[in-house]
């Protein structure tokens, strides 16, 4: 790959990283709470609720970010 192509790719990746959080910042969080922390190694499966399918939420458990079905508490 030429240096110009590599520079373009790097620029596009940087732009994508900067714009991704902004696009979901104005959206409200999905309803419900995250279930208890799973016992598994660190994984980064999602960045926010809107990167998860359906009603699932992006739940943060320290070094684990994963899509989980929400729990609802009355």
Swiss-Prot record:
A cellular component annotation (GO) from this entry: extracellular space
Disulphide linkage map: 34-59, 42-63, 46-58, 52-67
BP-aspect Gene Ontology terms: antibacterial humoral response; innate immune response; venom-mediated disruption of cell wall in another organism
Record keywords: Antibiotic, Antimicrobial, Disulfide bond, Secreted, Signal
Domain WAP: 27-71
Tissue-wise expression: Expressed by the venom gland.
Subcellular location: Secreted
Family in the record: Belongs to the venom waprin family.
Role description: Damages membranes of susceptible bacteria. Has antibacterial activity against the Gram-positive bacteria B.megaterium and S.warneri. After 45 minutes of treatment with this protein, B.megaterium have no visible pili and are smooth. Has no antibacterial activity against the Gram-positive bacteria B.thuringiensis, S.aureus, S.clavuligerus and B. anthracis, or the Gram-negative bacteria E.coli and A.tumefaciens. Has no hemolytic activity. Does not inhibit the proteinases elastase and cathepsin G. Is not toxic to mice.
Protein name: Omwaprin-b
Native species: Oxyuranus microlepidotus (Inland taipan)
């Amino acid at each position: 790959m030429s240096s110009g192509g590599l520079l373009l790719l790097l620029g596009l990746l940087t732009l994508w990283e900067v714009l991704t959080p902004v696009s979901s910042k104005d959206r409200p969080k999905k309803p419900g709470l995250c279930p208890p922390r799973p016992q598994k190694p660190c994984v980064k499966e999602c960045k926010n609720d809107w990167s998860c399918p359906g009603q699932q939420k992006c739940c943060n458990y320290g070094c684990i970010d994963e899509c989980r079905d929400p729990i609802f508490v009355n």
